[in-house]
């Protein structure tokens, strides 16, 4: 009723023009400031903003569907360059880690989204086509539907709005792209283990063939090692005549037995 009696759609105030044209907007003192509470730059959406990083308004690029979790804690350093949304929107919050990991969240006022795990499971394209070899072990959802009789005959007037199932006979993916059965994976693992055992046995045979040469050379090497170990074992402490104290510079005692102090080397200069 108010629009019929006193319609003001044809009236344009000077304030509206100033806001649209950003009249009086001062540039930022330095780039990189927090502009989370500022409005969206209308010129940037039209690719006509010449202020760049000094613009006091937010520069939003693309469609941002998820709120930045670092911005929620005040730790996001990307500013306008962030690929996530810097805006508190409950419908675009990121997914709750605890609910997705453990199936429950103890926080009653959790701001993050609690998505049902069942809704994440996709329909099995092979089962929708008619048959899935994985059966109940398939990781995709097997939904039983009633086939539309009219579609099987040749034509259904309901089209995509039909409440019955319209089967699709083309292959959803390559025949080799479907994940293998658990039995097939077990057999492949056994084959790989057998190959490893065969390789190890062949290496053992090669080493056994070369063993006589090593046995012929082993006594000489053993004698050398024994002589070296014997020389090291007979080595005892050096006589005191060959020991030089690094504190006083005299021979005949170790530094830990020196009685002249740590400045004794200055007396000899």
UniProtKB/Swiss-Prot annotation:
InterPro entries listed in its UniProt record: CPSF4/Yth1, Znf-CCCH_3, Znf_CCCH, Znf_CCCH_sf, Znf_CCHC, Znf_CCHC_sf
Transmembrane segments: none
SUPFAM superfamilies: CCCH zinc finger (SSF90229), Retrovirus zinc finger-like domains (SSF57756)
SMART domains: ZnF_C2HC (SM00343), ZnF_C3H1 (SM00356)
Cysteine-cysteine disulfides: none
Keywords: Metal-binding, mRNA processing, Nucleus, Repeat, RNA-binding, Zinc, Zinc-finger
ZnF (C3H1-type) ranges: 35-61, 62-89, 90-117, 118-145, 146-169
GO MF annotation: an example: RNA binding
Gene3D superfamilies: Zinc finger, CCCH-type, Zinc finger, CCHC-type
A single Gene Ontology CC term: mRNA cleavage and polyadenylation specificity factor complex
Chain positions covered by the region annotation Disordered: 173-239
Biased composition, class Polar residues, residue ranges: 196-234
Cellular localisation: Nucleus
Zinc finger intervals, CCHC-type: 243-260
Biased composition (Low complexity): 175-195
Example GO biological process: mRNA processing
Record-stated family: Belongs to the CPSF4/YTH1 family.
Reported function: Component of the cleavage and polyadenylation specificity factor (CPSF) complex that play a key role in pre-mRNA 3'-end formation, recognizing the AAUAAA signal sequence and interacting with poly(A) polymerase and other factors to bring about cleavage and poly(A) addition. Cpsf4 binds RNA polymers with a preference for poly(U).
Subunit structure: Component of the cleavage and polyadenylation specificity factor (CPSF) complex, composed of cpsf1, cpsf2, cpsf3, cpsf4 and fip1l1.
The protein, known as: Cleavage and polyadenylation specificity factor subunit 4
Organism per entry: Xenopus tropicalis (Western clawed frog)
């Amino acid at each position: 009723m108010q629009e019929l009696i006193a319609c003001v759609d044809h009236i344009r105030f000077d304030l509206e023009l100033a806001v649209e044209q950003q009249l009086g907007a001062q540039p930022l003192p330095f780039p990189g400031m927090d502009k989370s509470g500022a409005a969206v730059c209308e010129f940037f959406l039209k690719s006509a903003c010449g202020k760049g990083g000094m613009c006091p308004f937010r520069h939003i690029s693309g469609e941002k569907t998820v709120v930045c979790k670092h911005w929620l804690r005040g730790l996001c350093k990307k500013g306008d360059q962030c690929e996530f949304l810097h805006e508190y929107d409950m419908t675009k919050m990121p997914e709750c880690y605890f609910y997705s990991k453990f199936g429950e969240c103890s926080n009653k006022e959790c701001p993050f989204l609690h998505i049902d795990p069942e809704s994440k499971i996709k329909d099995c394209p092979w089962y929708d086509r008619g048959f899935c070899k994985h059966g109940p072990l398939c990781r995709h959802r097997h939904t039983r539907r009633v086939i539309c009789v009219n579609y099987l005959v040749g034509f259904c007037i309901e089209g995509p709005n039909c409440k019955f199932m319209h089967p699709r006979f083309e292959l959803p993916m390559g025949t080799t792209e479907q994940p293998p059965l658990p039995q097939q994976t077990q057999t492949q693992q056994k084959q790989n283990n057998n190959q490893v055992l065969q390789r190890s046995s062949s290496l053992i045979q090669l080493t056994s063939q070369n063993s006589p040469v090593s046995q012929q050379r082993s006594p000489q090497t053993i004698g050398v090692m024994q002589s070296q170990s014997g020389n090291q074992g007979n080595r005892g402490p050096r006589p005191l005549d060959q020991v030089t104290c690094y504190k006083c510079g005299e021979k005949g005692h170790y530094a830990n037995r020196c009685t002249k102090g740590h400045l004794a080397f200055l007396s000899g200069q």
